[in-house]
């Protein structure tokens, strides 16, 4: 799974997600763009990568434009209060509306639309498909 090699701090605050991102299709021909705020885990990013490579028959090129750089911690069940913050369980990428999640090229249009549609079902945020102008 994806995670940073080194971070300044091991544990972070949860934080708030505000604002929008005005992002364009830079690398590929088709892109998957988020329409909502949310967190995408490293497992979900890996699921997107697997789906697109499977349905594209390993042809074309895939760019994943997000990286999980925020640690999410949990406390074990039925533990008493205090004694510090919990352990890091998984890593997430913070997603804002308008963020490009992934891009693909080198695949026929019908197959690339289908790949991105299936990949959008794997995510906890609403998405849409963009085309390069």
From Swiss-Prot:
Gene Ontology terms: cellular component: mitochondrial large ribosomal subunit; plastid
Descriptive protein name: Large ribosomal subunit protein uL16c
CDD domains with a match to the protein in the record: Ribosomal_L16_L10e
Keywords: Plastid, Ribonucleoprotein, Ribosomal protein
Similarity annotation: Belongs to the universal ribosomal protein uL16 family.
GO MF term set: rRNA binding; structural constituent of ribosome
Keyword Heme attached: no
Cellular localisation: Plastid
Protein origin, superkingdom: Eukaryota
PANTHER family: 50S/60S RIBOSOMAL PROTEIN L16 (PTHR12220), LARGE RIBOSOMAL SUBUNIT PROTEIN UL16M (PTHR12220:SF13)
Annotated GO biological process: mitochondrial translation
Organism: Euglena longa
One Pfam family it belongs to: Ribosomal_L16
Subunit note: Part of the 50S ribosomal subunit.
Disulfide bond annotation, renumbered to this chain: none
InterPro entries per record: Ribosomal_uL16, Ribosomal_uL16_bact-type, Ribosomal_uL16_CS, Ribosomal_uL16_dom, Ribosomal_uL16_sf
Entry keyword Transferase: no
């Amino acid at each position: 799974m994806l995670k940073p090699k080194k971070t300044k701090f091991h544990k972070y605050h949860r934080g708030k997600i505000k604002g929008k991102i005005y992002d364009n299709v830079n690398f590929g021909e088709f892109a998957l763009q988020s329409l909502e705020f949310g967190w995408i885990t490293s497992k979900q990013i890996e699921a997107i990568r697997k789906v697109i490579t499977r349905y594209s028959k390993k042809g074309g090129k895939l760019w994943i434009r997000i990286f999980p750089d925020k640690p999410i911690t949990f406390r074990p069940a039925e533990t008493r209060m205090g004694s510090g913050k919990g352990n890091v369980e998984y890593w997430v990428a913070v997603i804002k509306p308008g963020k490009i999640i992934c891009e693909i090229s080198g695949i026929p249009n019908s197959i690339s639309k289908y790949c991105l549609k299936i990949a959008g079902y794997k995510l906890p945020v609403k998405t849409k498909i963009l085309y390069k102008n």
